[in-house]
A protein has these predicted regions:
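Alpha-helical transmembrane bundles and membrane-interface segments of multipass inner-membrane proteins
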Residues: 1-144
């Protein structure tokens, strides 16, 4: 919804809006993956990225189905939601619409969107859960 709103109402073909000295809303299309890697892969690349994303989402859904830890479930939900949001863009529009642009002077972080943020935050939740709440392994040896 954020991409639709930004694309159709806020930016509406404008190249960008400067909000602060370090943050802009921009009009950017990403045909590649995170941070515009593989951006020039063409129609075949787009199809392969869609298939890969669908397979990853399927694997994450299986993990989510089997997962017991609530924090990991939340993290997986965020990743799945973000991935599906970007997949819908890629299937419908042939590219993912990015609009968040953070920068320091002339040095810009690659533009991204809210779905990308959900993917990164979800991954961080899972990593932090693994670091601070490691899975306890049951001792399967019988004590004699």
């Amino acid at each position: 919804l954020t991409k639709f709103w930004m694309l159709n109402y806020v930016l509406n073909e404008r190249p960008g809006i400067e909000l602060t000295s370090f943050f802009n809303l921009v009009y950017a299309w990403n045909t590649g993956v995170s941070f515009s890697m593989f951006n020039d892969s063409g129609a075949t690349g787009t199809l392969l990225l869609c298939l890969m994303a669908a397979l990853i989402v399927a694997a994450l859904l299986w993990w989510l189905y089997r997962e017991k830890a609530r924090a990991v479930q939340i993290g997986l939900g965020m990743i799945i939601g973000g991935a599906l949001g970007n997949l819908v863009d890629r299937v419908r529009l042939g590219a993912v619409f990015d609009f968040l642009d953070f920068h320091l002077g002339v040095h810009h972080w690659p533009a991204f969107n809210v779905a990308d943020s959900f993917i990164c935050i979800g991954a961080a939740v899972i990593i932090l859960h693994g670091l601070f709440y490691p899975e306890k392994k049951e001792n399967k040896e019988q004590v004699k």
